[in-house]
Amino acid sequence: MKLGILAVGHKLPDWVAAGCAEYIKRMPRELPLVVQEIKPEPRAGKNREQLLAAERTRLDAALANYGCIVVLDERGVDLSTLKLAERLEHWMREGGDTAFVIGGADGIDPAIKARADDSIRLSSLTLPHAMARLVLCEQLYRALSVVRNHPYHREG
């Protein structure tokens, strides 16, 4: 099984890449975490629906290798770290590769949301794209540490 973060966007600042790389490195060999950048559609003369449809085509191609799709959405379920750990454990039991989709500036196409197995949000706050990617990497590592009883996460 592997976890994938499919993020619509451009190359992020070095500090974000370094932070993500640190948590990716900490993941065990049997549960690798990969980040794949999906090229955003150029805005020139296109409306929101056209932009999302073009990005959907790219996301669909990347999602073909994943059995479970989780979208990050501001209207998604608000999970605590322990609840995310429970979901991660469930996805691990299912055994298929799991993709986490972070949309671009205009969000995620409704067709991707409709076929997603789950919809979660990282925070009630609006996070910049770079921060969302880094927070997701850290939270997946933290959730795995809870599942594995590793001392990284401390309750209370």
Predicted regions and their residues:
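Post-transcriptional modification and biogenesis factors for structured RNAs
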Residues: 1-156
